Amino acid sequence: MNARIRVAVVYGGRSSEHAISCVSAGSILRNLDPDRFEVTAVGITPEGSWVLTEGRPETLAITDGKLPGVTGDSGTALTLTADPARRGQLVSLGEAAGEVLASADVVFPVLHGPYGEDGTIQGLLELAGVPYVGAGVLASAAGMDKEFTKKLLASAGLPVGDHVVLRARDSTLSLQDRERLGLPVFVKPSRGGSSIGVSRVTAWDELPAAIELARRHDPKVIIEAAVPGRELECGVLEFPDGHLEASTLGEIRVEGVRGREDGFYDFETKYLDDGAELDVPAKVDDDVAEAIRALSLRAFTAIDCQGLARVDFFLTDDGPVINEINTMPGFTTISMYPRMWAASGVDYPTLLATMVETALARGTGLR
């Protein structure tokens, strides 16, 4: 019997967050303990093809502003069989079609955005009977869609910001909605992340272009009223015995950093231009920190999440407001989720090991 746990790290994918998924995977591959885990790296191209890759972390990093990616030339074409009788087998699609290239005890789907973080790969893994890290189908789908995240949180009595959803048939905001939301507003793809396709609108004549940009990524657009306040984050982690813990808080500061005036934490600020400062732990009063940790655990439960999540807040004069919940947060070297857990006394390799062990303990199927 293989003493090490066989982990298939799946990354890349078809969404606009393909490159960030690759960067997250590189960080995870670098930090999974080789004495405990036998790791296989599986990349998904932007077109949706699966390839067995070498999984070298140095090839999965942002270098001189250039984003990494998976191509058809990155490795051997393969697929994961959905037959539960062949549980976890990664099968060749090449000349030796059907040959088992590797097998996995657990899959770590480091996929951000649609076609990965939204319940799609989770459904495939459930069909295949393969345990996987992170949330199940329902929580992944709900957490990916900002509209339904807010609906579930609000139904649980949790504080969320005012917003309007534009479906594909809706061209713009009504006059009544504009008056209610006020300016500025943030225009976002409803099912997206990493601030891709997001605009800050400070005048209504900017709205059509912002909607058009968001719709390049998702026909459904969410328009959110600006919430003045500090940006705080909290990590939630499930342990193999099923209990949950909330991490030390982190804070993102953009306004006033390196001459920034807009306070908008966009894609370039997050990943390319070092335009934000991250404080871990966040400088907040103990009672505020405890309240936000409690809200994070409630939000995790409200969407029926499993495994892990990062819950994002605005801290206003009237108290915390939940912005969103990320069921597969970033795992890059600068990402807040592993940093918050490190500040909580859980180092990166231990964090990853806990997530894998929790996935194995949970298994698949109805639970």
From Swiss-Prot:
PROSITE patterns: ATP_GRASP (PS50975), DALA_DALA_LIGASE_1 (PS00843), DALA_DALA_LIGASE_2 (PS00844). Disulfide bonds: none annotated. It is found in: Cytoplasm. SUPFAM superfamilies: Glutathione synthetase ATP-binding domain-like, PreATP-grasp domain. Binds 2 magnesium or manganese ions per subunit. GO terms for biological process: cell wall organization; peptidoglycan biosynthetic process; regulation of cell shape. Cell wall formation. This is D-alanine--D-alanine ligase. The gene is ddl.
